[in-house]
From Swiss-Prot:
Pfam families: Phe_tRNA-synt_N, tRNA-synt_2d. The keyword Cytoplasm applies. This is Phenylalanine--tRNA ligase alpha subunit. GO terms for biological process: phenylalanyl-tRNA aminoacylation. Disulfide bonds: none annotated. Signal peptide: none annotated.
Length: 352
């Protein structure tokens, strides 16, 4: 029978080897050496067959105590080695939080979006309310409520996308004005702008699109005059195109305003002397406007003898083309990164 001293020596040797294991692989080798099928502890168990029945229990208990001590020491050492490995990994992967971060490539505000926001901010500063409406609209609000009955010849001026006989894609944002007036139950004042997409059956080319944006404005109150319209539009022109700009009003025709005017701004490129932008005229057309037709007020429940108003409509697409020298409206809608990247520089410089 193996002596107790020798068994204790085996245990001491195993514990020494475990404590000296430098990594998890070395520890695994120690485990195999002592606890494997051909290991030292397994070799002790083979001696059981040579012992008497009285000796076997005590011997087996002693061997199990050695095995448990070795297993416990291996588990403790493994935990230490795993923590050391983790600490080393963390040390190697330490991030210096004082270093500058990697730059992220940022886009820029779309030139059309920037123009719309600029116009909206301008009118908000003048006390206007922004009102949105339906893009799929009823024929009544798109035409009839705006002094365009079904038999009116001016309907031919706008080729329309009809969904059903009485439902269509709006051809302007004027239906928002009609609905707003109707909701006010004949009580002023009303001071709104209506931005949004509109649709017409145009053939797409450099200056036309079947879908484009429009911003219309409406003011209805007592004693509103043509001079109020002119003063408002002069301010808008100066804010959008420069303080030195002037405007001129030319007689025109719109079914929902009377009188109606086309509004031109003095050319911001040549200062009115004549160039390719203004086609040598010194003036650039920017919007249409006029005094709200009494029929429109009456159909919405307003007393036209008490209330008057003015309305105007502008195309942000055209204004953006003029401001940024864009020659083709289709550039706004094709999402060409080469085109859009140009406006990142404009935004970085803080230009409008």
């Amino acid at each position: 029978m193996i002596q107790t001293e020798e068994m204790n020596q085996l245990k001491a040797d195993a514990l020494a080897d475990i404590s000296q294991a430098a990594d998890e692989k070395a520890l695994q080798d120690v485990k195999v050496k002592y606890l494997g099928k051909k290991g030292s502890v397994s070799g002790l168990m083979k001696q059981m067959k040579d012992l008497s029945n009285e000796e076997k229990p005590k011997f087996g208990q002693a061997v199990n105590e050695v095995r448990q001590a070795i297993e416990s020491a291996i588990a403790d050492r493994k935990s230490v080695l795993e923590q050391d490995r983790l600490n080393k990994q963390l040390e190697e992967e330490t991030i210096d939080v004082t270093l500058p971060s990697r730059s992220i490539k940022l886009g820029a505000t779309h030139p059309l979006t920037r123009t719309i926001q600029e116009i909206e901010d301008l009118f908000l500063g003048l006390g206007f309310e922004i009102v949105n409406g339906y893009e799929v609209e009823q024929d009544y609000y798109n035409f009839e409520a705006l002094n365009l009955p079904k038999s009116h010849p001016a309907r031919d001026m706008q080729d329309t996308f009809y969904i059903t006989e009485e439902t269509l894609l709006r051809t302007h944002t004027s239906p928002v004005q009609a609905r707003t007036l109707e909701k006010r139950n004949g009580q002023g004042p009303v001071k709104i702008i209506c931005p949004g997409k509109v649709y017409r059956r145009d053939s797409d080319d450099a200056t036309h699109s079947h879908q484009f944006t429009q911003i219309e404005g409406l003011v209805v109150a007592e004693n509103i005059k043509m001079s109020d319209l002119k003063g408002t539009l002069e301010l808008v022109a100066k804010k959008l195109f420069g303080e030195e700009r002037e405007i001129r009003l030319r007689p025109s025709y719109f079914p929902f305003t009377e009188p109606s005017v086309e509004v031109d701004v003095s050319c911001f490129k040549c200062g009115g002397k004549g160039c390719n932008v203004c086609k040598q005229t010194g003036w650039i057309e920017i919007l249409g406007a006029g005094m709200v037709h009494p029929n429109v007020l009456e159909m919405a429940g307003f007393d036209s003898s008490k209330y008057t108003g003015f309305a105007f409509g502008m195309g942000p697409d055209r204004i953006a083309m003029l401001k940024y020298g864009i020659e083709d409206i289709r550039y706004f809608y094709t999402n060409d990164v080469r085109f859009l990247d140009q406006f990142k520089a404009v935004e970085d410089r803080g230009e409008a």
